[in-house]
Curated annotation (Swiss-Prot):
Keyword presence, Cytoplasm: yes
Major localization listed first in the record, in broad terms: cytoplasm
Protein name: Uncharacterized protein C2C4.10c
Record's subcellular location: Cytoplasm; Nucleus
Record key words, sorted: Cytoplasm, Nucleus
Superkingdom field: Eukaryota
GO biological process, any: asymmetric protein localization to old mitotic spindle pole body
Keyword Nucleus: yes
Gene Ontology cellular-component annotations: cytosol; FAR/SIN/STRIPAK complex; mitotic spindle pole body; nucleus; old mitotic spindle pole body
Organism: Schizosaccharomyces pombe (strain 972 / ATCC 24843) (Fission yeast)
C-alpha cells in the first residue's frame, strides 16, 4: 500500500466511519422490514382464515383487505430484496475498508520498526562517539597533567636558580 499522509489517513478514517454508520442504518432498516414483513404475513394468514366463510367466498370488503395486505407484503418483500443487496454492498465496502485499514496498520508497524532500528543504530553511534570523546578527554587530561607537572618542575627549577643567583 502506498504511504498515506496524515490528511489522507484522516479522510480514510472518516470514510470508514461513514460507511460503518450506513451499514448500521441499513441493518436497522433490514430488521424493521423483516419484523414488518412477518407481521403482515401473520395478518394475511389470519385474514384468510378469518374471512373465509362456509360458501368458500369472500365478501367484497374482506377480499380488498386481503389484497391490500398482500400488495403491501409484496412491496415489502421487494424492498427487503433491495435492502439485502444494499447490505451485501455495504459489507463488501466495509471489508475493503477493513483490508485498507489492515494495510495501513501493517505499513505503520513496518515504518515504526524501521524507525526503531534507525534510532537504535543512531544511539549506538552516539554511544561510540561519546566513548571516543571520553577517551580523548582522558588522554588530554593525562597530557595536561603531565604538562602541569612539567611546568611545575620548570617553575621550581627557575625559582631555585633565582634563589641561587641573586
Amino acid at each position: 500500500m502506498t504511504e498515506l499522509h496524515p490528511d489522507e489517513q484522516h479522510v480514510f478514517l472518516q470514510c470508514l466511519n461513514k460507511m460503518q454508520k450506513e451499514l448500521d442504518l441499513s441493518f436497522e432498516r433490514y430488521e424493521r422490514l423483516f419484523k414488518t414483513t412477518q407481521e403482515l404475513q401473520e395478518k394475511v394468514k389470519f385474514s384468510s382464515s378469518r374471512f373465509y366463510n362456509k360458501d368458500s367466498t369472500y365478501s367484497k370488503d374482506q377480499g380488498l383487505a386481503k389484497e391490500s395486505a398482500a400488495l403491501e407484503l409484496q412491496k415489502l418483500k421487494q424492498e427487503n430484496v433491495l435492502l439485502r443487496k444494499d447490505l451485501n454492498n455495504l459489507e463488501q465496502i466495509s471489508d475493503c475498508y477493513a483490508k485498507g485499514m489492515d494495510d495501513i496498520m501493517k505499513h505503520v508497524a513496518t515504518y515504526t520498526a524501521t524507525m526503531n532500528e534507525r534510532m537504535n543504530a543512531c544511539h549506538k553511534e552516539y554511544i561510540k562517539m561519546y566513548e571516543a570523546l571520553a577517551s580523548e578527554r582522558n588522554s588530554l587530561y593525562k597530557i595536561n597533567e603531565q604538562n602541569v607537572q612539567s611546568l611545575n618542575k620548570v617553575k621550581e627549577w627557575l625559582l631555585k636558580s633565582l634563589e641561587e643567583e641573586p
